[in-house]
């Protein structure tokens, strides 16, 4: 949309100015925000203290959720008064909504200083500097990826758990989804660079890593070297290779696509001790007709067959899902098919959404949009069914011993003084702590009660292992990962070479 930036931002262009990044949306946005924070601090900005108005506010936005535009512009409206009271304050808007709306952001909110998209995260410091110098808004949206996010520095949010992108973009054409048009076609990182980033995090105390992509099990479809043939076993190889990294205790991934989910991935999950017994597998609908209209290239029978295979190899796996209610043309019969699949699948939990038209998607133009009242009724019925199943599945764990990675989200309430942690299968557990239990430490507890969305362990702590991540949390420190260069092709997967203190591989370079 605009010319490529020619000037280079000075290393200390932030000159001690404070910043805050506010994130809306998915895990991909959360990870992108870590990159934005790393970029700003690399340019001299410092995080704003709690309760202090920052000099720069960056909104990393979502265009998928219902009313995402109203939420953004409503928030920007509130920011105008704050900016009027703080001369020199800058507001930047990035992410999927910025990629979609472009100049419209400034037209609707003229007090915004910078608009940047999903393909040019690295432009943010320069755009802030240029806007301040020129005293006008800078809007820069690229139609294709400028640089892989892995070449940007990152300031991690957590001392004990980290995101690592395996790819960006998506090659699917789901009729309800706007993500491919905003993030582009899938592009995959070299496995050697993924392993180097995982190893760098582990060396700084991180014990849990989640591999992240719009469709992680399609990994290997589009490396930078287009002459290389696709390797359909690339993701399972990556899981096994990550599992060989010493010190990595928990490995997760999100999200796979049922059409691409193969037996070699199930085998890698079952045979790699670090891989957690958890699978998030989006269903979207249990109706084959609706799945066809959604352009989801699988049917309910195949979906359930995958779950059977996973449970055969990993009997105690916790399986979660995404479901959309009220897709255009969905009949009561279609919805009943979804309820039937949910009953058979026995998900430990489900993220359920009421369909909302997203401008620019084929589904938004479809006939037979389902009335809002009907969608609400079906949503409540689905929710009630899944709540029952979730509680039934959780109650099966009463009396079992669970290993928890303690979380940093404080105590559950003042009366019980419970802390929270995640079991290896991803379930949330509220437990009664004993002694100096820190976020990032590992405890074992016995489950004493259950509810649909969490487990309770009020019998004390059976064991407590202090960790380096706990030490980092106590010091108020989080890992940082330095830029990883862009490389070509897909080398054979092996354990990563030793990394420098900054987290870069000593000899490799890769793509994200």
From Swiss-Prot:
Domain MTTase N-terminal: 17-133
CDD domains given in the database record: Radical_SAM
Cofactor note: Binds 2 [4Fe-4S] clusters. One cluster is coordinated with 3 cysteines and an exchangeable S-adenosyl-L-methionine.
Catalyzed reactions per annotation: N(6)-dimethylallyladenosine(37) in tRNA + (sulfur carrier)-SH + AH2 + 2 S-adenosyl-L-methionine = 2-methylsulfanyl-N(6)-dimethylallyladenosine(37) in tRNA + (sulfur carrier)-H + 5'-deoxyadenosine + L-methionine + A + S-adenosyl-L-homocysteine + 2 H(+)
The keyword Cell membrane is assigned to this record: no
GO molecular function: 4 iron, 4 sulfur cluster binding; metal ion binding; N6-isopentenyladenosine methylthiotransferase activity
Binding site for [4Fe-4S] cluster 1: 26, 62, 96
Binding-site residues for [4Fe-4S] cluster 2, renumbered to this chain: 170, 174, 177
Top-rank taxon: Bacteria
Residues of the TRAM domain: 395-461
Cofactor(s) the protein requires to work: [4Fe-4S] cluster
Segments of this protein annotated with the region Disordered: 473-512
Signal peptide: none
GO terms for cellular component: cytosol
Keywords on record: 4Fe-4S, Cytoplasm, Iron, Iron-sulfur, Metal-binding, S-adenosyl-L-methionine, Transferase, tRNA processing
UniProt-listed InterPro entries: Elp3/MiaA/NifB-like_rSAM (IPR006638), Methylthiotransferase (IPR005839), Methylthiotransferase_CS (IPR020612), Methylthiotransferase_N (IPR013848), Methylthiotransferase_N_sf (IPR038135), MiaB_methiolase (IPR006463), rSAM (IPR007197), rSAM_horseshoe (IPR023404)
Function: Catalyzes the methylthiolation of N6-(dimethylallyl)adenosine (i(6)A), leading to the formation of 2-methylthio-N6-(dimethylallyl)adenosine (ms(2)i(6)A) at position 37 in tRNAs that read codons beginning with uridine.
Subunit structure as annotated in this protein's UniProt entry: Monomer.
PANTHER family according to UniProt: CDK5 REGULATORY SUBUNIT-ASSOCIATED PROTEIN 1 (PTHR43020), MITOCHONDRIAL TRNA METHYLTHIOTRANSFERASE CDK5RAP1 (PTHR43020:SF2)
Family from the record: Belongs to the methylthiotransferase family. MiaB subfamily.
Protein name: tRNA-2-methylthio-N(6)-dimethylallyladenosine synthase
Species this protein is from: Corynebacterium jeikeium (strain K411)
């Amino acid at each position: 949309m605009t010319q490529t930036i020619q000037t280079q931002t000075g290393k200390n262009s932030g000159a001690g100015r404070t910043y805050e990044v506010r994130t809306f949306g998915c895990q991909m946005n959360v990870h992108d925000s870590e990159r934005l924070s790393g970029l700003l601090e690399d340019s001299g900005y410092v995080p704003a203290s709690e309760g202090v108005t920052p000099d720069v506010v960056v909104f990393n936005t979502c265009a998928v959720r219902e009313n995402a535009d109203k939420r953004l512009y409503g928030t920007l409206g509130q920011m105008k008064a704050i900016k009027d009271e703080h001369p020199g304050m800058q507001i930047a808007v990035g992410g999927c909504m910025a990629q979609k709306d472009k100049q419209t952001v400034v037209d609707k909110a003229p007090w915004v200083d910078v608009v940047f998209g999903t393909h040019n995260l690295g432009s943010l410091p320069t755009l802030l500097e240029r806007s301040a110098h020129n005293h006008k808004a800078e809007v820069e949206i690229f139609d294709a990826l400028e640089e892989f996010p892995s070449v940007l520095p990152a300031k991690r949010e957590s001392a004990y758990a980290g995101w690592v992108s395996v790819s960006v973009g998506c090659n699917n054409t789901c009729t309800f989804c706007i993500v491919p048009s905003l993030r582009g076609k899938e592009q995959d990182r070299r496995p050697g660079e993924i392993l180097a980033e995982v190893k760098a995090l582990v060396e700084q105390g991180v014990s849990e890593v989640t591999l992240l992509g719009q469709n992680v099990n399609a990994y290997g479809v589009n490396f930078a070297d287009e002459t290389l043939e696709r390797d359909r076993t690339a993701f399972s190889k990556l899981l096994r290779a990550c599992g060989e990294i010493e010190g990595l205790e928990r490995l997760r991934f999100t999200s796979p696509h049922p059409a691409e989910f193969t037996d070699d991935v199930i085998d890698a999950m079952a045979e790699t001790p670090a891989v957690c017994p958890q699978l998030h597998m989006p269903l979207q609908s249990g109706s084959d007709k609706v799945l066809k209209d959604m352009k989801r290239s699988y049917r309910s029978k195949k979906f359930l067959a995958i779950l059977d295979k996973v449970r055969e190899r990993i009997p105690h796996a916790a399986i979660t899902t995404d479901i959309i209610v009220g897709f255009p043309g969905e009949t009561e019969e279609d919805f009943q098919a979804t309820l039937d699949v949910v009953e058979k699948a026995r998900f430990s939990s489900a993220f359920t959404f009421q369909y909302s038209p997203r401008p620019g998607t084929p589904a938004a133009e479809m006939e037979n949009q389902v009335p809002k009242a009907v969608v609400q009724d079906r949503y409540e019925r689905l929710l009630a069914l899944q709540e029952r199943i979730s509680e039934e599945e959780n109650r099966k764990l009463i009396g079992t011993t669970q290993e928890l990675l303690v979380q940093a989200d404080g105590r559950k309430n003042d009366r019980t003084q419970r802390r929270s942690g995640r079991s290896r299968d991803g379930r949330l557990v509220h437990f009664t702590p004993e002694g100096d239990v820190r976020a990032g430490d590992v405890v074992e507890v016995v489950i004493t009660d259950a509810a649909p969305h969490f487990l309770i362990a009020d019998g004390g702590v059976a064991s407590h292992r202090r960790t380096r991540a706990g030490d980092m949390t106590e010091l108020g420190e989080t890992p940082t990962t330095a830029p990883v260069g862009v490389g070509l092709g897909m080398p054979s997967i092996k354990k990563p070479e030793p990394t420098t203190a900054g987290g870069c591989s000593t000899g490799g370079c890769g793509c994200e």
